[in-house]
C-alpha cells in the first residue's frame, strides 16, 4: 500500500474518481478498495453494460458474456438475460429522450478516457459525451433516485459535484478553475431509470462547491499521510485537531 501512495505522490499513478470517492468516505475504505477484490452488484454491471451499448456497442460482445458457458477459459464479465434486459431498458430510455439525438450529433467524442493534473495530483476521468462546450455523464439509478429531492441527496452523498468539477476542469490548479468558472464547459447528468430519463444541468455554483470539496480531499490526503492514518474509518474526518500537518 505504501508503494501505491508513494506513486500517487510522485505523480506516477493517477487516482480514479471511484478511488478518490472511497477516500472521501474514509482512509480505510480507500485501502479496502485498493487491496481487496471489488465485487460489483448486478445494478453496477447493468449500468456498465448500458454504457457500453450506448457508446461502444461493437466491444460489448468481447467484454461481456450473456448466459452460462462450459468454457472455463472464458474471462468475460458474466451477465444474465435479466441483467441484459434491464440494461437495454436504460439504453432505450436514454435514446428515446427528446434531446439525446441532438446531444449525440453535437458530440465530438464519446467515452473518452483522459488523465488530467490538478494541484499536482493526477486524476483519471471518463467523459461519456464531450460536446465542445458541454460534458454529459450518464447515471443509471433506481426509480426513486431520479426525483429532484433524492437526486440532490445523491449528489452530496456520492460526491457527484466533485466528479462534475473533475470532468470540466481545464486548468492545472483548482484556484484557476474556480477563477475562470464561466469559461469551463457546462455539465449535465443524464439520469436514467428502467422507466424514465431526465437530463439535469449542474449549476456553476455546485461545480465550484465540488472544486472546494476536492481541495479539502487533497488536504485530508496530506493529513492522512502525515499521521499514517490509513486504518482509520470516518472518524478520521472528525479529528482535525489531532491530525494537523506539521509545517
Which positions does each model-derived feature cover?
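Hydrophobic (often cysteine-bearing) scaffold residues that line and stabilize catalytic clefts
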Residues: 42, 46, 163, 210
Amino acid at each position: 500500500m505504501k508503494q501505491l501512495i508513494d506513486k500517487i505522490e510522485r505523480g506516477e499513478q493517477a487516482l480514479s474518481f471511484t478511488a478518490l470517492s472511497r477516500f472521501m468516505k474514509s482512509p480505510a475504505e480507500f485501502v479496502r478498495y485498493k487491496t481487496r477484490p471489488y465485487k460489483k452488484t448486478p445494478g453496477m454491471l447493468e449500468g456498465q453494460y448500458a454504457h457500453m451499448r450506448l457508446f461502444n456497442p461493437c466491444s460489448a460482445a468481447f467484454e461481456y458474456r450473456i448466459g452460462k458457458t462450459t468454457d472455463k477459459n472464458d474471462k468475460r464479465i458474466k451477465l444474465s438475460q435479466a441483467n441484459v434486459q434491464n440494461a437495454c431498458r436504460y439504453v432505450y430510455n436514454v435514446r428515446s429522450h427528446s434531446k439525446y439525438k441532438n446531444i449525440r450529433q453535437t458530440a465530438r467524442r464519446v467515452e473518452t478516457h483522459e488523465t488530467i493534473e490538478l494541484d499536482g495530483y493526477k486524476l483519471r476521468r471518463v467523459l461519456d459525451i464531450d460536446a465542445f462546450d458541454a460534458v454529459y455523464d450518464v447515471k443509471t439509478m433506481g426509480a426513486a433516485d431520479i426525483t429532484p429531492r433524492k437526486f440532490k441527496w445523491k449528489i452530496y452523498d456520492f460526491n457527484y459535484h466533485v466528479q462534475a468539477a473533475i470532468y470540466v476542469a481545464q486548468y492545472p490548479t483548482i484556484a484557476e478553475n474556480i477563477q475562470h468558472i464561466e469559461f469551463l464547459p457546462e455539465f449535465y447528468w443524464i439520469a436514467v431509470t428502467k422507466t424514465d430519463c431526465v437530463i439535469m444541468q449542474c449549476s456553476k455554483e455546485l461545480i465550484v462547491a465540488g472544486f472546494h470539496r476536492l481541495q479539502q480531499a487533497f488536504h485530508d490526503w496530506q493529513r492522512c499521510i502525515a499521521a499514517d492514518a490509513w486504518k482509520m474509518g470516518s472518524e478520521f474526518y472528525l479529528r482535525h485537531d489531532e491530525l494537523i500537518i506539521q509545517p
